[in-house]
UniProtKB/Swiss-Prot annotation:
It holds the Pfam family LysM. This is Uncharacterized protein YkzQ. Residues 29-72 form the LysM domain. InterPro entries: LysM_dom (IPR018392), LysM_dom_sf (IPR036779). It comes from the Bacteria. PROSITE patterns: LYSM (PS51782).
């Protein structure tokens, strides 16, 4: 190995970068639909607009079914 210079990896230039943002899981308060429930009665009982329930649950109509789980709001 005469005349050869061994290569040394330079670790000093490697900087660990932290992410600029962190993702947190979103949790929701939910409601289990019972027989006789409507979006209107659910919205009224939680004091939120029907349209907010529809948007949050990606509903295209106001039809809901017993046993369905409806997101109410983020926790």
């Amino acid at each position: 190995m005469k005349g050869k210079i061994p290569k040394i990896r330079n670790q000093a230039n490697k900087v660990k970068r932290t992410p600029r943002y962190m993702e947190f899981p979103v949790t929701y308060e939910v409601y289990h639909v019972e027989s006789g429930d409507t979006l209107w009665t659910i919205a009224k009982s939680f004091e939120i607009p029907v349209q907010q329930l529809m948007n949050l649950n990606k509903l295209s109509s106001d039809r809901i079914y017993p046993g369905q789980i409806i997101k109410i709001r983020e926790r």
